[in-house]
Amino acid sequence: MIVVRAFAVLLATLLAASTAFAQDAPTHEDTRTQYPAFLANSYFSINAGFITYDFSQAQLEPGFRAGSVDVPHVVARVALFGHEFNDYVSVQGTYMRPVRYVRYVGVNGDSGAQRVWMHYGGLTLKGRLPLTTRVSAYGEGGLAITSRHGFTMNGQTAVRDVHYASPVIGAGLEYRVSPTWSFTGGALYSPGRDSDQQPHTVAATGGFRYTMRPLPASKVEENRRSGYLFPANLVQLEYSTGYGYGVNTFVSHDIPVFWGGNVRVDRGIALHYDRNVFHTRKVFALDFGGSVSYWRSQANQQRFSTLSVYPLLRFFIFRTKPADIYAVYSLAGPTYISQSQIDDRNTGNHFTFQDFMGLGAYVGRSRNVSVGVKINHYSNGNILTENAGIRIPITFNLGYAF
């Protein structure tokens, strides 16, 4: 109750201050309707397809045998961020995982099934050769991280964890639909490691790529003169309550658009700064931000902290006279976490990723005040063999935009 009252007092103060400051605030030319240099000709891609790796009895430690080994073959691969240096050379960071994991069924007569998690991270250099005005061939090569999380039975390791770096190569074709949209299709090879009975991996995928091309001057000017406000800076104070885990469960299980976690947070406070770098005419804004956060776990009341940088997608749902309502989604923000063992669970090491999603509003005459609610998540995406994951429930935020 004290926290709620403090937030209410702070909100009223900010609203009063924003009204006063709006009288004399100088007008600055908005230069954020064109992609900044580091984003122009950058891209992301989403692909799905077929994966094969020779999982069998060979991966089991001596003394273990499975009744059967189920190897699903559907895989997803995304380029989280790529950049074209010119028409022929680009670099990209990728993430790949099977939709369903390998299962060892009936190990030593057990009635259940045990899963082996496989995940791959990659950083590759990509060369492109135009074949026609729309079709190009490409080859890629670089560094891959292979992460296998095995399982134990009765306190004994049945399939061991494996984590290693290796070269990775691939090739394929691209079909350019427009300057920004392309269809892609290709194959990828990642070597195994005999010393750990890890088989090599072959994946064939297809999908699409979106490239952020510099906008024409007419579009830039149209967006700039739209009359809709997009604050350039936002400073927010956030408080996590320890309540509302049903929201996390709903969006991670019932409608899988977010993630859960094994470690629960009881209380937390965070300070965020967001800087807008691009926006469209009315709906979309892209921010980059940083945050420092302090948390207390639910089970053991263990204290830990995080330091993050992150991208943030902001979508304005309604533009009304009293407020501009928006949704936010942030994915894979690199994070330092002070503890890796929390509530007797192994979350990996001191490197992880921050994700969050929520709703908010800019209010006040000049939209200087931001209020909102969101949920958070920390996870290394199983790029490390241990990844308990941290879920953070309903979090209230209050901020000042300028």
Specify the residue positions occupied by each region the protein language model found.
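Transmembrane beta-barrel strands of outer-membrane/channel proteins
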Residues: F44-T52, G93-R97, G139-I145, G185-Y189, ...
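Gram-negative (and chloroplast) outer-membrane scaffold detector with strong preference
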Residues: L80-T152, G207, V265-I337
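Solvent-exposed loop/turn segments connecting transmembrane beta-strands
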Residues: V71, R193-T201, V263-R264, Q298-R303, ...
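Short glycine/proline- and aromatic-enriched beta-strand/turn motifs that initiate or cap beta-hairpins
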Residues: A22-G82, T201-R275, I394-A401
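Repeated loop/turn-to-beta-strand initiation elements of outer-membrane beta-barrel proteins
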Residues: Y88-V91, T133-A137, Y175-F183, P214-K219, ...
